[in-house]
Amino acid sequence: MSNLQDIVVKEMKVKPSVESKSETRHIIQFIKNYVQSHSFIKSLTLGISGGQDSTLAGKLCQLAVNELKEDGNDCEFIAVKLPYGEQKDAAEVEDALTYIQPDKIITVNIKPAVDQSIQSLKEAGVNLTDFQKGNEKARERMKVQFSIASKQKGIVVGTDHSAENVTGFYTKYGDGAADIAPLFGLNKRQGKQLLAYLAAPKHLYEKTPTADLEDDKPQLPDEEALGVSYDDIDDYLEGKSVSSESKEIIENHYIKNAHKRELAYTRYTWPKN
């Protein structure tokens, strides 16, 4: 294992393997402890896309909230559907919600807000690319979640896990923004492992991962956008050897997107010593 890989593995907290029962218990307890340590928290809010990550985070949140209620805490889990117009995999969103059984479901169509924002920018002489429009969608979704959390006296739960974090495969202040990130420390295959343990419908964690933010490239697979497979990313994070090409791609993503993993720099934190 190279020096940089060793640094990355330690930073990303991924273990070579996880035991499903204890790992699930550890994440649920983390969520419960956070809520119980902040008396103002009355809800957990999370956007549900129908993919692996939000399905897992949603299930763990609902399980944690169920236990909190049993302990006498006033708390609820709010699942948010955030389509941009018609969502191509809307059926899988419904399947995820049926599996999660959230306390409350809220639906907000982000299309009017995103389109108006893009039009206003265009009128100001700022013409966004399709990729940049995708980031607008991600940020609008997170804005909505924070609005709901504020109204419901709660916090926003993120779906960021270590295979996304290491590559910076998320929108800064979009899906990368949240109050807690309970999946951090897991890689992609470990997330699948926990969903299998929690008896999730197989098609929700075996579907091809996609951010699906670009109109010109609908359902673009994550692995195609990243230029490397999740299997290689997972192997790298578990401290295993990967091809020199995959290693270079992963480490380039890690270095290039370091700013996404930091809070806003100040004159006291940049340049780093």
UniProtKB/Swiss-Prot annotation:
It is an enzyme of class 6 (ligase). GO terms for biological process: NAD biosynthetic process. The keyword DNA damage does not apply. InterPro entries: NAD/GMP_synthase, NAD_synthase, NH(3)-dep_NAD(+)_synth, Rossmann-like_a/b/a_fold. Mg(2+) binds at residues 53, 164. Deamido-NAD(+) binds at residues 139, 172, 179, 259-260. Keywords: ATP-binding, Ligase, Magnesium, Metal-binding, NAD, Nucleotide-binding. ATP binds at residues 47-54, 159, 188, 210. One of its GO terms (molecular function) is metal ion binding. It catalyses: deamido-NAD(+) + NH4(+) + ATP = AMP + diphosphate + NAD(+) + H(+). Pfam families: NAD_synthase. Its EC number is 6.3.1.5. Pathway: Cofactor biosynthesis; NAD(+) biosynthesis; NAD(+) from deamido-NAD(+) (ammonia route): step 1/1. Catalyzes the ATP-dependent amidation of deamido-NAD to form NAD. Uses ammonia as a nitrogen source. Belongs to the NAD synthetase family. HAMAP family: NadE_ammonia_dep (MF_00193). Homodimer. This is NH(3)-dependent NAD(+) synthetase. It comes from Staphylococcus saprophyticus subsp. saprophyticus (strain ATCC 15305 / DSM 20229 / NCIMB 8711 / NCTC 7292 / S-41). The gene is nadE.
